[in-house]
């Protein structure tokens, strides 16, 4: 017999700070809005409902607990890897697949994600009873390696497009002799060497002729970890960096702009950088010309222990404490300069904001000039002993709490 299955889409209510959707779209609480539409489907006689969205693993679990009528949650955004048993590749599972959540009304609701980059195909087998409740759920992500046959129709279409793009994207920019760590697990949680490379390139691009007062007009760069989208493996292709790989790292086509702001606003930005550290969100700032120390045991808004910046009005550049009332020049992505990722304190206007060059051009030109790159993790972003460890456990503890809730 045919069965009616309802699918309701959702996306994060944080979209206005993560992207630029314009002024005419309203993003509301996922649970409240999903409940409205689940109720509509229920009145139409649909008793099997899938919530399909992009709000992150914690929100997926909240939806599973709170929304009456939703039987399965298929999520994204945090690129969470779930797997039952021994994983087939290098990703470490954040929990079983499916991740079972007990709803507030006593049902078992499977929650799934399947990592990112098309590396896996999510596979979930669900059995419902006559009332539409899940009585069994099983499966695992399928690793799309060479053992999985390619779809020949899609492959032909892709190959046709690749021919047109191949000459452009296959351009060799330079070489890396170290792993350029641009993973979510690195750049959104602590200092990452690919973030250092990007910001160093931006500073280099903005070097001007020194004068009697300054060795350069700007010494600082910041970039949000969420804007770094992919690593580059030095063991692949003999370490050669192509334009295609660099485009995977910086795919959004933004610019790096020059902003003049007070030290107090910059301090506020660094507090925002870690105000919800440990959740895998993209606010954490990667830097150049800045050294920051955090204490994550303190409450949000009071976590910056020290913030030192590289002097410009000096013959020998050294790090000096940030002055709250002093005006500084900072290089940053255009996304941040328009208040993206919640950085309203960085939002500039025509009086203090100057647009710069395309991000991929800046980094590409720098790598070409250097020929070989080997950026290190240097202690630009550090955490007091023990506090980073606690924050990185936050995701795991969140999973444990949910699992305990289910067991109890």
From Swiss-Prot:
Recite the UniProt keywords alphabetically.
Answer: Disulfide bond, Glycoprotein, GPI-anchor, Hemostasis impairing toxin, Hydrolase, Lipoprotein, Membrane, Metal-binding, Nucleotide-binding, Platelet aggregation inhibiting toxin, Toxin, Zinc
**Comment on activity versus temperature:** Optimum temperature is 5-37 degrees Celsius.
Known activity regulation? Is potently inhibited by metal ions Fe(3+), Cu(2+) and Zn(2+). Is enhanced by Mn(2+). Ca(2+) and Mg(2+) have no effect.
- Binding residues for AMP: 188, 224, 229, 252, 335, 341
The coiled-coil regions, if any, are none
Query: Is the keyword Secreted in the record?
Result: no
Note the Pfam families from the entry. 5_nucleotid_C
**Top-level EC class, please?**
hydrolase
Q: How does it sit in the membrane?
A: Lipid-anchor; GPI-anchor
Q: List the disulfide bonds.
A: 187-192, 199-221, 311-314
Pro-segment residues? 385-388, 385-408
Name the domain of life this protein comes from: Eukaryota
What PTM annotation applies here? Venom 5'-nucleotidases (or a part thereof) may be released into the venom via exosome-like vesicles. They may be attached via a GPI anchor to the membrane of these vesicles. Soluble forms of 5'-nucleotidase might be released by cleavage of the ectodomain in the exosome-like vesicles or venom gland cells.
- Membrane-crossing residue ranges in chain numbering: none
The free-text function statement in the UniProt record for this protein reads: Hydrolyzes nucleotides into nucleosides. Prefers AMP as the substrate but also cleaves GMP and ADP. Does not affect AMP, cAMP and cGMP. Inhibits ADP- and collagen-induced platelet aggregation. Snake venom 5'-nucleotidases are widely distributed among venomous snake taxa, but there is a lack of information about their biological activities. They have been shown to inhibit platelet aggregation. This effect may be due to the liberation of inhibitory AMP or adenosine by its action on ADP released upon initiation of aggregation.
- Its recorded name reads Snake venom 5'-nucleotidase
Originating species:
Macrovipera lebetinus
């Amino acid at each position: 017999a045919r069965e009616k299955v309802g699918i309701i889409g959702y996306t994060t209510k944080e979209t206005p700070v993560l992207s630029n959707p314009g002024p005419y779209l309203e993003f509301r609480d996922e649970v409240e809005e999903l409940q409205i539409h689940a109720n509509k489907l229920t009145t139409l006689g649909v008793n099997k409902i899938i919530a399909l969205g992009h709000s992150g693993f914690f929100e997926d679990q909240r939806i599973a607990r709170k929304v009456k009528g939703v039987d399965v949650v298929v999520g994204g955004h945090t690129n969470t890897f779930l797997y039952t048993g021994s994983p087939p590749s290098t990703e470490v599972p954040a929990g079983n697949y499916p991740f079972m959540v007990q709803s507030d009304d006593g049902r078992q609701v499977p929650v799934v994600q399947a990592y990112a980059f098309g590396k896996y195909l999510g596979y979930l087998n669900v059995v419902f009873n006559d009332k539409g409740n899940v009585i069994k759920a099983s499966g695992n992500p399928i690793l799309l390696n060479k053992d999985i046959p390619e779809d020949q129709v899609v492959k032909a279409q892709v190959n046709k497009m690749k021919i047109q793009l191949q000459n452009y994207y296959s351009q060799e920019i330079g070489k890396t002799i170290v792993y350029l760590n641009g993973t979510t697990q690195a750049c959104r949680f602590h200092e990452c060497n690919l973030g250092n490379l990007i910001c160093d390139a931006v500073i280099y691009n903005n070097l001007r002729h020194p004068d009697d007062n300054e060795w350069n007009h700007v010494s600082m760069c910041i970039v949000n970890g969420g804007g770094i989208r992919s690593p580059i493996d030095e063991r692949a292709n003999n370490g050669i960096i192509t334009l295609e790989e660099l485009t995977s790292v910086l795919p959004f086509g933004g610019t790096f702009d020059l902003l003049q702001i007070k030290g107090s606003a910059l301090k506020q930005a660094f507090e925002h950088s870690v105000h919800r550290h440990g959740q895998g969100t993209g606010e954490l700032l990667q830097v150049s010309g800045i050294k920051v120390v955090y204490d994550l045991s303190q409450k949000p808004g009071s976590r910056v222990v020290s913030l030192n910046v590289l002097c410009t009005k000096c013959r020998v550049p050294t790090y000096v404490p940030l002055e709250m009332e002093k005006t500084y020049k900072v290089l940053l992505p255009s996304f941040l300069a328009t208040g993206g990722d919640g950085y309203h304190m960085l939002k500039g206007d025509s009086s203090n904001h100057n647009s710069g060059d395309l991000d991929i051009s800046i980094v590409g030109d720098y790598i070409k000039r250097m020929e070989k790159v080997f950026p290190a993790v240097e202690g630009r972003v550090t955490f007091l002993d023990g506090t980073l460890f606690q924050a990185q456990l936050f995701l795991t503890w969140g999973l444990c709490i949910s699992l305990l809730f289910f067991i109890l």
